[in-house]
Amino acid sequence: MSELTALTIAEARDKLKAKAITATELTDAYLSAIDAANDAINAYVAVTHDQARSMAKASDERIAKGEAGALEGIPLGVKDLFATKGVHTQACSHILDGFKPEYESTVTANLWADGAVMLGKLNMDEFAMGSSNETSYYGPVKNPWRAKGSNADLVPGGSSGGSAAAVAAHLCAGATATDTGGSIRQPAAFTGTVGIKPTYGRVSRWGTVAFASSLDQAGPIARDVRDAAILMKSMASLDLKDTTSVDLPVPDYEAALGRSVKGMKIGIPREYRVDGMPGEIEELWQKGIQYLKDAGAEIVDISLPHTKYALPAYYIVAPAEASSNLARYDGVRYGLRVPGKDIADMYEQTRAAGFGKEVKRRIMIGTYVLSAGYYDAYYLRAQKVRTLIKKDFEDVFAKGVDAILTPATPSAAFGLADEVLANDPVKMYLNDIFTVTVNMAGLPGIAVPGGLNGQGLPLGLQLIGRPFEEETLFQAAHVIEQAAGRFTPAKWW
């Protein structure tokens, strides 16, 4: 069975097409793998055995009739942020206890329309707030990777930790994820997988539980660049139900793979050389530069002067939008309800019991920066900084730079229940230092494995592109992947 779960999406697609395997066999192999591993890894919060089998059966029937879709019979995991009709959708929060939506998100509807099979819902940081998948009501996810000679559990990154861990542990062929400040790219880097955050507006947000509406964007996490390109093609679409959705044709991203990067201009931002950056990250970055150089790309030094303000500005804008978005959870119509002596007390009791510590922290920060006395001092200034960050990128791209290469994270995966990080939220927030600028500017960014560190843990590189030029990112990421190789964790679970 494990040889079936070892297939990439591209390989499984070809075997299904050739009728060498059936969608039912493939789905059963994944369900068996999940049943055997999920107690150890905790990647899934709900497994849809019956639905998966009936979707696989329907796929086999369509394949037999010659009516196969682009993802026919491919078993996928869905981050618990996407509405799935009649299936557990709780953003891994206690406050949404028992919530099963009456509708399907646009992203998942697109995937099912192309023939994909749903294996279940994936664990994540509560309401997508976190960088380690430790804020989930359903407990932390364990990274399938471990340091050489160690049994210590590591975090998979966040907030899409369940998506990244499930892909790395071969508990799904690919997964949906979301990225508000790095929640696709950071977990991908921590697990040796590939994750792309598309341009803001490229993929519909409809039916995705909102965290920070002007920053949220859905994308795939997959085992390699080709699989990420295949998934992205199905996920992206114009959607009139999302006012930020852009009416641009969706290219065949897979076709960009294998194109030469000869003459492509790759920018290296000097501001990303942050104080205290570990030597292994600097080394990885140099390796990435060399890979692209060897393939014929032109490397240029660039400046993004407002980078140092990105993290503080992000941690004002995102909580402000979150405090507004999360005001709707009150226990009245759905989810958890804790009785109170009157309606105001019921709201208070429900929200106090329903939200976790990190979500409460961000709601409080957001409410504070939006309050009348502080709005100008914090929120307005953060939005001005955001405009300057966007302009930095526009200036660089105007000079002919095609893509920007940076590290994806400031370190490899760290330990589960790290006391220093648990007691200092700002240290935890620093995990997003290389990724937040991309969300602030609405640009596309991809994380691709660049190598392993001295402890045998994966390290990721990030490529940032011009708006709606994801093809360039797939093209350059594929070159890095070909040079660096692919990485799979040694099985301990």
UniProtKB/Swiss-Prot annotation:
Gene Ontology BP annotations: translation
The family assignment reads: Belongs to the amidase family. GatA subfamily.
Return the Gene3D superfamilies for the record: Amidase signature (AS) domain
Which is one Gene Ontology cellular component term of this protein?
glutamyl-tRNA(Gln) amidotransferase complex
- Keyword ATP-binding listed? The answer is yes
The name under which this protein is listed is Glutamyl-tRNA(Gln) amidotransferase subunit A
State the gene name recorded for this protein: gatA
Q: Which organism is it from?
A: Brucella suis biovar 1 (strain 1330)
Active site (catalytic residues): K79 (charge relay system), S159 (charge relay system), S183 (acyl-ester intermediate)
Record-listed E.C. numbers: 6.3.5.7
Give the keywords, sorted.
ATP-binding, Ligase, Nucleotide-binding, Protein biosynthesis
A single Gene Ontology MF term assigned here is: ATP binding
